[in-house]
Amino acid sequence: DFSAGANDLSYGFKRAKLAWYSIDPIFYTQKPSGISNEDLSLNKTRRIFSRELYPVTDIAQGQTQVISTLDLTYYPSERGPYNNSLNTASNPISNFGGIMRAVNSTNFEQGNVEYIQFWVLDPYVGKGETPRSNTGKIYFNLGEISEDVLKDGRKQYENGLGPDQILASPRPLWGDVPASQSLIYAFDSNVDNRKNQDIGLDGLSSANEGAVYTNFASELDPAADDYTYYLNTSGGITDRYKNYNGPEGNSPVNINDPNRGSTTFPDVEDINRDNTMNTINAYYEYSVDIQPGMTVGQNNITDIRSTQVTLPDGSSTEARWLQFKIPVSQPENTIGNISDFRSIRFMRMFMTGFSSELSVRFGALDLVRGEWRRYTNTLDFNDTNVADDNTNLDVLAVNIQENNERCPVNYVTPPGVQREQLYNNNSIINQNEQSLSLRVSGDGLEPQDSRAVFKNVSIDMRQFKK
């Protein structure tokens, strides 16, 4: 649980460094000083084109042919923000780094959300691949997740800070916190006050953080929460994004500041911006292993796409993409008091178990819903309990764009079916074509047994005579 029950600074002792970002196109079109073609040819930084992941997808004229990947670079041996531990590097596999977000459509049962589906570039294949001994897990949490990032029961919001604001007294564990209730999330229009507000979730500037993070009081950034713009630093691409997610100083007053900000809004302990801080933990947990030699049929992997790509340095390398489909209805663990999928307000993703730096690149990351629903009642009047058959039914969608090279059986367009065509800017764009796939697993179907799906429709049939 990574010291989740702690009520002191040890609550953050297992938090390691994690950077999440989408690489700016400027690195490929107008290379900043210090960035070479060799840097742009690494598996973790090279540009991903649509034809690599979706080779049969037609791109309309004028549309981008580049996939803007979500990249996560995890540094398990380096302390993350608000971590006062001196032992982060001594046992990296026990550390974690994670991110969370709000979910807009919260009723998964009504929306029939069935899968967490994503494409990941295999980090163990390609130029600059990850050492094969560096393995771990990616976890996903769905449900009610505490927004109290720095656990103290008080909601931090940066625009409530500053010399003219009322702060909690005595000072809470992690730093300064506003004593008043938030009404809006907007910085002060006064330039001087603004500088005193954009100081991170601990409510302390770097000059004052040493009083709390005493083990690192001599460093320039004792709380390890400073923001750095990726074009205002040096090193490789992943090095430049290393501090891009820091909340202190990420909203500079002057828009012409070379240290350009990442947001114009205050950082708050209110992920879904409903003006309240949720402190309840009641969620479902899922995970996938990240390791060499991942294959279809294991670890929730449903498809693999391998191809050769040409790199900016003139060489070529193999690219191996893995498609994961995690059934939402089959969590590994259930934490807290949650019994259904009618109120899934948050999603969290975190990495753990790795021994050294690792970059994971998501070509797509979706919550997938279906129009077809499983029929859970019995179809055999002699067997009223279908739950004891150990028969699993997966309801999937397969399509020509993503699964045309799927192993062991690839998807092909059915006989007599032609892909719908769209005329766009004097060009013909073939639309995606897909089918419903029913897959039985577990012990399979018993003799004379069956499984079914159904679909709710709203069609008035009274106007038809037959």
Model-inferred region functions:
Residues 1-466:
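Extracellular/surface-associated beta-sandwich interaction domains
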